[in-house]
Amino acid sequence: MELGSDVSSSFAHAVELIGGIPDLNTPEREVLVKVGVFAPKQEQYTTIPVARAIVESFSETPKLWFIESDNYRGTGTKRLQIWRELYSDRVVPYNLSEDTDTRTVTIAGEEMALSHLLFESRVLVSTHTLRFYEKGSVIKNLFGLPPMKKKAQFHKNLDSVLLDLFEVVGGIDLAILDGTFAYPGPGSGQKTRIPANVFLVGRDAVAVDTVGAALMGMKPEKMPIIQEAISRGLGEGDLDNIEVVGCDFLEMQERIRPSRKRKKK
């Protein structure tokens, strides 16, 4: 979907195109918005206008929690301040690392304590940026659910960790890739983000990551995270079976072409 000057209207239209979210936007269910931000200085995170549009799309929900956890670069509490202008009595930041009410689960063969918020009847929204990264974006965003500050030990089995987390919390109810900017990623010939002004919204997180990866020049059929998600039955990872509405796919690819150029070796 093209991101117009009125971001909220563009987002609302995108939600309509995927059939709306009446089952998610209800007075009976709170919403967890998993924002993804590794380090604020990198500016690779969902923009405030898109985050505001997400909040506005859940007009009926009694409470929205913007959630993040600590990492070795700092606390989740501090990183969540990026969206502080959106916070109110209804929209609140929450550091998962500070929750003492947890449930122990097994992730990639190891026990892990996760926040109680993740196991109650809440809607889970995962929002991240359009980027060149082999582990995707909205699914990789789940790596911010574990509360520990140092998570490097999980990188050796990262695909399993991410997909186990996906299954343990009941999946992602709404996946959003903010393509206000496209980020080329490590090893790219493009060193800075470029304006793309597109975004992807979908109920199938695997499909959203698949389309996002293809837009950035990657081949989903060669991405282990996507293929493992398919084998587990977690979503659709075949581009031929994914309907993209609201914007021409090839046109979107052309728009972000500068960020897809790779260095020749």
Kindly give the residue locations of the regions a language model identified.
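N-terminal and secondary-structure boundary signal
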Residues: 1-265
